[in-house]
Amino acid sequence: MTFFPENGKSNSKGMLCVNHEFGRNTHVIGKPDPESKDDVRLSQHAHGVSVVALENKGGTWQTVDSPNARRIHVNTPVTFSGPVAGHRLLENKARNPFLGTVNNCSDGETPWGTYLTCEENFNGYFGATGDYARTEARERYGFSENGFFYGWHKFDPRFDLSNGDYANEDNRFGWVVEIDPNDGGQVPVKRTALGRFKHEGAAVTVGRGGRLVVYMGDDQTFDYIYKFVSEDNWKSMRARGLSPLDHGKLYVARFNENGTGDWLEVTHDNPVLAAKFKDQGEVLTYTRLAADALGATPMDRPEWATVAPNGEVYCTLTNNSGREVADAANPRAPNRDGHIIKWLDNDQHTGTRFVWDIFLFAEDTHGTEETFSDPDGLWPDPDGRLFIQTDGGQKDGLNNQMVVADTRTGELRRLFTGVTSDEITGIAVTPDRRTLFINTQHPGNGDPMRTNFPAPHGSGKVPRDTTFVITRKDGGIVGS
């Protein structure tokens, strides 16, 4: 979620982009399995991104009309750019158009004012009505006969892995998608130079020489942390009609035992990858396989990355109960509660070396006032505070929450606590930092027997996701 203030500076009016990551069938269509194409369409259109206009009127934030407000879903026309655009791995015999985005998790914001939404667990929306090609790539990305039991493949052939006319439809998902919040007619663009994997988020910063840098986590146990560096100054590239997100290099991280690290080049110019892949389009479509071949460090579920004002990069590693052998960067085996790692790149984010350290272990907070588990969302403010959101089973009798850490002292304080079985996710602020937007996702996991939130208790209504507006009573900076 990101707030785009009107004229780049308004504290009371702007566009809010919000991801709709997933909705279970029982929650959205009222039954465990779809029984028709209409059921599938309803489920599909509950996924995607909303772009809404907000205004603070008399102290109350509310939606207002705007020609740029829109809903982007699984059947919205999209386009591809970068090295994979026009590649054979995106072609289907059905010659169907490029459509949709799904399982949109976290996000990023470009310096030119566009929204980057990240496709995460896209594999779960595919299934098979018959035999299908169980390729190495499909196995690595987690495709299966039933997926996550959405059942779309039963009524929509695009998501049927056994339908040969749509053999490459699965390759059309797993990308970072760029959306212009101030142009309702813009076609969302899948930026393929950033790789294809289970994108959690896209932390954007500007490095040496004005080059654009994007840090990204692949949200699965034993997967990797990536960064993308544009080939030139981002302003210069845009002035020449080039997208900084289309031209540059992708890297994957290797964390060494001595507290140093290396960014390994994920390009076809790398001899290791030239021996395994036909071209750069294939390297990027199968980014996970490329990173495997390079010997990147398997991490404990890399989720949000964020760049602090001092240049340090933080990344949440949510948990990994399946880890049996610890290493320096993932030193708890099993890692049931997660940790946060930080690093500092050389050459102002554009180099290939870095130094790293563990910022904190969630397990170490248990039994204290600072207790939390399963760190997920991250946002650093300019004053050295790190806002941390959680998405798993909390210890010490708590629900999911948002805590604030002092990055200098390590002190933690709780700012927000959610309802049962929800996830605290998304964070956006107005330019003056006196208004903070956050979300609760899938309260009660969509089960009205657990909670009716935000409806009054006992009303019988299905629980709904909610965006909260947080301000201080004294009008000060939130979190201070």
Predicted regions and their residues:
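Conserved small-residue
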Residues: 1-480
